[in-house]
Amino acid sequence: MKIQLIAVGTKMPKWVEEGFQEYRRRFPHDMPLELVEITAGKRGKNADIARILQKEGEAMLAAVPKGNRIVTLDIPGKRWDTEELAVQLESWKLDGRDVSILIGGPEGLAPACKAAADQSWSLSPLTLPHPLVRVVMAESLYRAWSITTNHPYHRE
């Protein structure tokens, strides 16, 4: 199973790139973690936010390979603790489809992305900076994988 993070935003700070890559490289070859960056729409004083969200959403959905499970990151989504995420990871593997996780931009996700989702996941009731979410996602997914394989990374 391949896990694909599809995130709005490019040109992240060096610490984000390094943090994401640190965890991405730890994933096993049979469960690679891939990042697809979607260019954010230009936001300005008179920006049409609804139109920007629509365009970002179209680009995100176009990046999802046909047949993938779509999981959106959204504050009202389901919250999983680490062990519950490990159970979800196992469930996704048994489903037999690759997984695309959608991370929206500053205004969140387009309605079309939410409508296309098989699941919605909430990392936290807090609003997190989008660059940080990439690193947190990579680490959380790696930790969940480590639980499913009895790897010593996760300690209770």
Swiss-Prot record:
MF terms in GO: rRNA (pseudouridine-N3-)-methyltransferase activity
Catalysed transformations (reactions): pseudouridine(1915) in 23S rRNA + S-adenosyl-L-methionine = N(3)-methylpseudouridine(1915) in 23S rRNA + S-adenosyl-L-homocysteine + H(+)
InterPro entries: Alpha/beta_knot_MTases, RlmH-like, tRNA_m1G_MTases_N
Pfam families: SPOUT_MTase
Assigned keywords, A-Z: Cytoplasm, Methyltransferase, rRNA processing, S-adenosyl-L-methionine, Transferase
Keyword Cell cycle: no
Localization annotation: Cytoplasm
Ranges in a coiled coil: none
E.C. no: 2.1.1.177
Transmembrane segments: none
Record: residues binding S-adenosyl-L-methionine: L73, G104, L123, S124, P125, L126, T127, L128
CC per GO annotation: cytoplasm
Known function: Specifically methylates the pseudouridine at position 1915 (m3Psi1915) in 23S rRNA.
Family per record: Belongs to the RNA methyltransferase RlmH family.
Record note on quaternary structure: Homodimer.
Name assigned to this protein: Ribosomal RNA large subunit methyltransferase H
Organism: Vibrio cholerae serotype O1 (strain ATCC 39315 / El Tor Inaba N16961)
Gene responsible for this protein: rlmH
